[in-house]
Every structure is written in structure tokens, then in C-alpha cells.
């Protein structure tokens, strides 16, 4: 009989039975089949293979992106074990991810999701899941509408990230917990709840919870919904289509190993490569291969793209800054929303969001500073289940602390550096290459960053983070 664990609803979830047959993909062909019994199927990192079980309780060990597992519906209790970040496919019940700083995401069923000895981000997805960190400082992420989950080993250095539930303070959390035997039950919304196994309320503390943005303390100071693109002409307009230090034909950031030239659409020799378009209230920034006709004007760069700044129109000290955007998922695309000092110095720099197109589950949040006398950076790579379509990317900058948000849920935080207390302006851009690496296909289909809006807010004078 297989071992089970009880989920938040009191339902038993199975770990699967013990294996009775073992298979290795080393030396196999592209397909490796199991038996009708309980199989252990071991991939090989150098073998491009799909392993296919049968009706038993199967466990698959995956070591690289060319290793795959496939199961039919209702064909036993099946588990994937991997060091890689992994999203559980349908028809699988359980997942173990052991890689440090990786993620393990469940599917629509009720899953058992486990981490390893290091830090992981664990999200059961839909269903009523059982989540185990298994050591390290883990992040357990939950989204409204995805069911009721149980954390089996919530530790003092673990964090719960709550998205869509409206909790804005630790006091709000404590007001919604109740002890039920050895377990602590947090009522969420719509009949959903989160159970902390073998935990009492006095074991919780505020820094274990990444909560929602409290918008009641914000006053809007800037908004562009992109019904049109208001380019600056020196006397009016909102957006500068080039860095303040760049010549009229535009520029790029050579120190970042970027592969694109930021085109200024008001510069006639490159106007044919205008990277900006507006449709139905959405600004699209397009990166694409540079035509030979303009490469003399773009210093021979292989790609063209666009960037916008509010250097000449808007800067602010502290507040909340937000962009709602649909990010590209193309290899080598490097979209960003960020802040720079209004006096033209660098550092500091505050990156609200950066992404690499080929890694859509990672939201990068960074603060750069010179407070130690040399340039330093504090970066966080927040793991999220889905960035397809439009999402909100924001940062709350206060005198004491910086907090980054994804869809109104806090995902990272850092102390405000001593040299970040002066007005900063906003930038939106789509780079190619650099940290994201080169495109694998020459970007023949182009890459698009779509921006629904950019907004900024000041903070109420008597509010503290």
C-alpha cells in the first residue's frame, strides 16, 4: 500500500507505490517505455528522450531539458523528480524539485509538491495541494481561485506569497487565523484557506508574509494609458525616445553588450524603422533585424528597437511606480522598466522589472548603488507561474525600504541605499542580447513588448511601510 498525506480538506493524497521495475535512458532511443507495474525511469542528461509509463505508479528522474515524461490520464500516481525548475504537466500527481533557487509548480490536480535542501519557490497551482519545502528558505506562493493548500513544514525562514486575497498587513493575517488541533488555518477568500501543519499563531512573524499593495495610501502623480504616444518635442510631450545624453539618431548601451540600436523615430534617416506603434490603447515596442539601408546610421548594429524615458517631463522622489505590460517570450529579448536619477548621474538605478524572453517564469528586481564607494547591486529573481499576457510590474520606493510587486503581490524587498533619496525618472525599453543572450533565430519574427499603461503615485505623508 502506498504512503499518503492528508491535504487541507482532509483528503488523502498518495505518494505512489514502491517501484518494481527500473529503466535507464542511457543508450536508449528517443522513446523509453515502462511496464504496467510501478516503474522508476531514469533519464540521461545527454539523451533526447521521452519516457512513457503505463498504468502503475511511476517516478521519472529528469536531468536536462531534452528529458521528458509522458503519462495517460488516470494511469496511476505518477511523480517527477528533477533538479531543474519545473512545471508539472497534466496527468502527473507529484513533483520534487531539488535545485537551489529553482521553482516547482503544480497542475490543475491536487498535487504533492516538494523542494530540496536549498531554497525553492513552490506553487501548487489549482487543486488542493500539499506543499513541503524540505529545508532552506522557501517561498510558498498562492493565488486566489486555486483551492485550499497545506504547508507541511513551514519554517521561520520560509515566506508565504499571497496574490489576490487582499491582505495588506500582518495584523490582517492574524485576524484571519484559527487553531484547529495542531494545525493553524488561515481563511483566505471564497471559502479557500491555507493550513500550516503543526504550527501555532505565536510562531508566525510579519516577515514571513509577502502581502498585497495597499493602494489606499497612494495618490496618482503620473499616468499614460497610451491612447497616443506623446513624444517630447522639447517644449511639450511626455516621452523622450532616446537617452538624454544620446545624439539625435539614438544610441545603445555598449557596456551591457546589447545587440540593438534604440531608434529615435523623429530622426529622418532611421524613421522607416520606427519601433513604436499604438493600437487600442496599447503601446507596442518592436525589436527586429536592422535593414541594410539604415545600418550606417545605427553604427552597424544587427537589430533595432525602442526606448522611452520621462527625463524631460517627470521625476519623483519615493512613491509607487507601475507598468502593466505583456512581455516578449523570444530568446534574447530583454524588456525592462526602470528608474534613473533626474540629475543624470549613475548609479543609483532602480530596476522595477527586467526579464529574459526565454525565461518567462522569472521576474528580476534589482537596485544598484554607489553607497559603498563602488557600484554594487542587490538583485532578486522572483519565480512566478505565468507572465503570458498582461501583468502589473511595480516598485514601492520609500525612504527606508524598496518593495517590488507582481500583480499587486510583493515578490522582493531591499533596504533603500543611502544614495537613493533624490528624484528619479522612468524608462521603458526592449533590449536584445546582453543579459538575455543572443537570439537563436536571428529574431526573424521580431519581438514585441506591449505596454498598457505606466503610472506613478506619491505616498501619504503619514504612511510608513
UniProtKB/Swiss-Prot annotation:
Classification via Gene3D superfamilies: 2.60.120.200, Serralysin-like metalloprotease, C-terminal
Highest taxon of the lineage: Bacteria
Domain (GH16): residue spans on this chain: 213-462
Example of a GO MF term: hydrolase activity, hydrolyzing O-glycosyl compounds
Keywords: Exopolysaccharide synthesis, Glycosidase, Hydrolase, Plasmid, Repeat, Secreted
EC number(s) stated in the UniProt entry for this protein: 3.2.1.-
Catalytic center residues: 349 (nucleophile), 354 (proton donor)
Subcellular localization: Secreted
InterPro entries to which the protein is assigned, alphabetical: ConA-like_dom_sf, GH16, Glycosyl_Hydrlase_16, Hemolysn_Ca-bd, Serralysin-like_metalloprot_C
Hemolysin-type calcium-binding repeats: 33-50, 105-122, 123-140
GO biological process: polysaccharide biosynthetic process
A Pfam cross-reference name: Glyco_hydro_16
Biological pathway: Glycan metabolism; exopolysaccharide biosynthesis
Chief subcellular location: secreted
A Gene Ontology cellular-component term: extracellular region
Family: Belongs to the glycosyl hydrolase 16 family.
Free-text function comment from the UniProt entry: Cleaves high molecular weight succinoglycan to yield LMW succinoglycan. Dynamically regulates the molecular weight distribution of succinoglycan by cleaving nascent succinoglycan only during a limited period after its synthesis, perhaps before it undergoes a time-dependent change in its conformation or aggregation state.
Protein name, as recorded: Endo-1,3-1,4-beta-glycanase EglC
Gene: eglC
Amino acid at each position: 500500500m502506498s504512503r499518503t498525506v492528508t491535504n487541507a480538506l482532509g483528503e488523502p493524497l498518495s505518494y505512489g507505490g514502491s517501484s518494481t521495475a527500473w529503466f535507464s535512458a542511457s543508450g536508449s532511443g528517443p522513446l523509453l517505455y515502462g511496464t504496467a507495474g510501478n516503474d522508476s525511469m531514469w533519464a540521461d542528461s545527454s539523451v533526447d528522450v521521452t519516457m512513457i509509463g503505463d498504468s502503475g505508479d511511476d517516478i521519472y528522474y529528469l536531468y536536462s531539458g531534452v528529458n521528458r515524461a509522458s503519462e495517460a490520464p488516470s494511469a496511476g500516481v505518477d511523480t517527477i523528480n528533477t533538479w531543474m525548475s519545473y512545471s508539472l504537466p497534466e496527468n502527473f500527481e507529484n513533483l520534487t524539485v531539488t535545485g537551489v533557487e529553482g521553482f516547482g509548480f503544480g497542475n490543475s490536480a491536487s498535487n504533492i509538491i516538494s523542494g530540496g535542501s536549498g531554497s525553492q519557490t513552490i506553487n501548487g497551482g489549482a487543486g488542493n495541494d500539499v506543499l513541503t519545502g524540505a529545508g532552506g528558505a522557501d517561498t510558498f506562493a498562492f493565488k486566489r481561485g486555486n483551492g485550499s493548500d497545506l504547508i507541511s513544514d513551514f519554517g521561520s525562514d520560509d515566506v508565504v506569497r499571497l496574490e489576490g486575497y487582499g491582505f495588506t498587513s500582518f495584523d490582517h493575517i492574524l485576524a484571519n487565523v484559527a487553531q484547529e488541533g495542531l494545525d493553524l488555518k488561515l481563511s483566505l477568500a471564497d471559502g479557500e484557506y491555507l493550513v500550516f501543519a503543526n504550527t501555532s499563531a505565536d510562531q508566525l512573524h510579519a516577515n514571513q508574509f509577502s502581502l498585497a499593495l495597499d493602494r489606499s495610501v497612494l495618490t496618482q502623480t503620473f499616468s499614460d494609458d497610451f491612447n497616443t504616444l506623446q513624444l517630447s518635442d522639447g517644449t511639450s510631450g511626455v516621452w523622450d525616445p532616446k537617452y538624454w545624453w544620446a545624439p539625435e539618431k539614438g544610441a545603445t548601451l555598449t557596456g551591457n553588450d546589447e545587440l540593438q540600436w534604440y531608434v529615435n523615430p523623429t530622426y529622418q534617416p532611421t524613421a522607416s524603422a520606427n519601433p513604436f506603434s499604438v493600437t487600442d490603447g496599447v503601446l507596442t515596442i518592436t525589436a527586429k533585424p536592422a535593414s541594410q539601408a539604415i545600418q550606417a546610421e545605427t553604427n552597424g548594429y544587427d537589430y533595432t528597437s525602442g526606448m522611452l524615458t520621462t527625463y524631460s517631463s517627470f521625476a519623483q522622489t519615493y512613491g509607487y511606480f507601475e507598468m502593466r505590460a505583456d512581455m516578449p517570450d523570444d530568446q534574447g529579448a530583454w524588456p525592462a522598466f526602470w528608474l534613473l536619477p533626474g540629475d543624470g548621474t549613475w548609479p543609483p538605478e532602480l530596476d522595477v522589472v527586467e526579464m529574459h524572453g526565454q525565461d518567462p517564469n522569472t521576474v528580476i528586481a534589482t537596485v544598484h548603488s554607489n553607497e559603498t564607494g563602488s557600484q554594487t547591486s542587490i538583485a532578486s529573481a522572483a519565480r512566478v507561474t505565468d507572465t503570458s499576457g498582461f501583468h502589473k510590474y511595480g516598485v514601492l520606493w520609500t525612504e527606508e525600504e524598496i518593495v517590488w510587486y507582481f500583480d499587486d503581490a510583493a515578490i522582493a524587498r531591499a533596504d533603500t541605499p543611502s544614495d537613493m533619496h533624490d528624484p528619479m525618472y522612468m524608462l521603458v525599453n526592449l533590449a536584445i542580447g546582453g543579459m538575455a543572450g543572443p537570439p537563436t533565430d536571428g529574431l526573424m519574427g521580431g519581438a514585441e513588448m506591449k505596454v498598457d499603461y505606466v503610472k506613478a503615485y506619491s505616498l501619504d505623508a503619514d504612511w510608513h511601510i
